[in-house]
Amino acid sequence: MKKYIFIIILSCLIATSASARKTGCEGDCENGFGKWTYTDKTTYEGNCVDTKKHGQGTESWPNGYIYRGEFKNSKWSGQGVLTFPDGSTYKGEWANGFMNGKGTFTWSNGKEKTGIWKNGKLQE
């Protein structure tokens, strides 16, 4: 059940980020380093290529979620860490905005689960 909750949460975060309108940019948000602020108060600070999140960056939501890591074409791709509001984290590989590849989920109580993830689901 927890696997499905994570998938739902990640899907909502990705959908919200993709649909929120940008309201302002500081720096070079076209081809360089900049900070975008969205109408829902989500922020992105990092590298941009052709006005897309691309390279290293940090995306933060007002509800406490924070992703730090690599982006490709505005999606989480490569190595990254997602921190949940309760302090839980996922650290590992990402592709197309989902946990894909080797990674470790650490709950706020310190319990860990390491394994191979595919489209946000732990493969057991």
For every predicted segment, state its role.
Residues A15-S17:
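N-terminal signal peptide c-region/cleavage motif recognized by signal peptidases
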Residues T58-E59, N63-E70, L82:
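Alpha-helical adaptor scaffolds
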Residues K22-N31, T43-H54, I66-S77, T89-N100, ...:
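Conserved anchor residues at repeat-unit boundaries in beta-strand-based tandem repeats, strongest
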Residues Y4-L13:
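Sec-dependent N-terminal signal peptides
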